[in-house]
Amino acid sequence: MDFPHLFSPITIQNMELKNRIVMTAMHLGYTPQGEVTDQLVNFYAERARGGVGLAIVGGCPIDEFGGMVGMIALNDDRFIPGLKRLTDSVKNHGAKIAAQLYQAGRYTHSAMIGGRKPISASAVRSRLTGETPRALALDEIPGVQDKFVEAAIRAREAGFDAVEILGSAGYLISQFLSPITNLREDEYGGSFENRMRFGIETISKVRKALGPDYPILLRIAGNDFMKGSNTNHEAKIFSAEAEKAGIDLFNVTGGWHETRVPQLTMGVPRKAYVYLARGIRSAVSGPVISSNRINDPEAAEEVLRSGGADLVTMARGLLADPDLPNKARTGKSRLITHCVACNQGCFDSIFQGRPATCMVNPRAGREAELQVKPAPKSRKILVVGGGPAGMTLACTAKDRGHHVILMEKSDKLGGQILLNHSIPGRRELETAAIDLIHNLQDKGVETILEQTATPSIIRRMAPDVVVVAAGAQPAKPKIKGIDGDNVIQAWDLLEKNIETGENVVILGGNAVGLETALFLANQGTLSPEVLHFLMVNRAETPETLTELLNRGNKQVTVVEMTKKAGADVGLTTKWTLMGELKRLGVKILTQTEAVGITAKGLQVEDEQGPRFIAADTVVLAAGSKAENELADQIGDQVPEIHVIGDAKKPRNVLAAIREGFQLGLTL
């Protein structure tokens, strides 16, 4: 497929971009002291080599009161030499680079700024930090605006091609703009015109300082998705005024960090928020960028072709595959490693204070350290198991010049990833397996399906190395009645879509248990097509449609022994999963132990004592156990044996892919 819109150039003031692909600012955690590091330079250099048109880096704190540890600092001249090294590297590889000017306001943690209170438009408590900021005094406001100006000047001096003013996501400019965080009674509060004043004045000052030709971007929320706050209507008015004040390019996102409307998780449909960019585009004369959940060139091309935006962002898409633009441009889209919006390596890591990585790209953030180089000697490597660990190992070893044979006992590759196909909002995870399969095929890895690796078969094949990546098998707890006819494993249910009764109890509140509950609770709810039909034809009231969306034909209960369900679900995705389960009426019982199963349900014990939960079907989601017996069986038959992925220890997909890749580099 060709992408004529995606790879057409565009000029923003004096900045010419070779294509319409923008990598938005991401908190990466690669600059622990604020100084540019080799890690940061190598990361962005690889994306520039991969063909991105514009890379926006940041957020870059403009002062010492509105940032956090690990961000790229722009608040002092001493950071300029390091930033110059970064901009030179990116531009030497054919891309343009911009700096995002960041002031978090009430989203700043006081612990990050020496215990001082963060600043904001008003003293309104932040649900993100749990802290209440102090309202800026009237005479303090010009000084904060001047910090934006000073940071912008530093950015230009450091070689950045443009700056982006951060006016979205609930940060400081958003806080002045919104009636729920701006309760001021002076000229910066009250009417919408007054609430716009802080942002518009800031933009005007930056424009005046940088001159008429230097590109200035504005990151703006097309809708705050906060009750009582600004919608696309207000965003359009603000954008029109911002353009008059000096903005050349609008980068449109949605929501605040406090919003309960998911923005980036897997359950958000691709291109879901293009309509926000389209709204801003109707209000301004300059170009507009559409953000969020655009992670492949086909989707990006459609956004541009349909007039939804003039440019598109692919931040996590480029974290997953730095070469995405070049692959699309040269007809190799099939070999793109797609972001699947899992958040395991990026957002989950950042929110836990760790540097960002990527589930599907273990080199992310370690570009210089983890390079695929030819092996000293080609060897015959047998990989047993076609899940993510085995496939990643096979691809990496093949790239290094080894003769690789991949053997899988089932009739298809993918392992446990394929179980996600049936789960609403999780189906995109299957893309990770599809991408690995495409790369196996492209590299010419010999693949044998429907063949169990036995000691005798391995002996005849005579490999130099055997890598056991056979995954795991579901655990079977020792409970009375566990072998009953009404008991099934969650894995079997998801793989084979086994029919259950109307009342279902799931034993285990881990990720598999909760996602199985989501799968079952959605059965019988309205499909998107039917919902669209009924809405267009006004066949039912909104209340009836909501009820039909929220209730299926099964009553689902999850039983979990520990205090909290979903302990193995990522922090940045758990809230969406739990919200969906609540919406669908799934009951979750914690600190509840299963003691027996009968034909009529599950006997449990909790703090109140024993009780019985009626159920037609009991689904087991009680964890898994490593499948690695083969390693012991062939221990004296081959020169070298390794065990990776869930066969070593059941964990998540990120760990499986990382282990496969890292072992592949050492063989």
Feature-to-residue mapping (PLM):
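Rossmann-like dinucleotide/flavin-binding elements
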Residues: 304, 378-407, 413, 448-456, ...
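Short, contiguous acidic/charged loop-to-helix segments that flank catalytic cores in large enzymes
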Residues: 263-269, 371-373, 378-379, 419-431, ...
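N-terminal Rossmann-like dinucleotide/flavin-binding domain of flavoprotein oxidoreductases
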Residues: 415-463, 562, 567-591
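Flavin-dependent oxidoreductase catalytic cores
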Residues: 1-384, 388, 393-404, 412
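Flanking helices and flexible, charged tails adjoining ferredoxin-like Fe-S electron-transfer domains
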Residues: 203, 367-376, 399, 403, ...
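Helix-enriched interaction subdomains in cytosolic or periplasmic regions
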Residues: 340-354, 458, 462-479
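Short connector loops at secondary-structure junctions
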Residues: 63, 218, 253-257, 408-423, ...
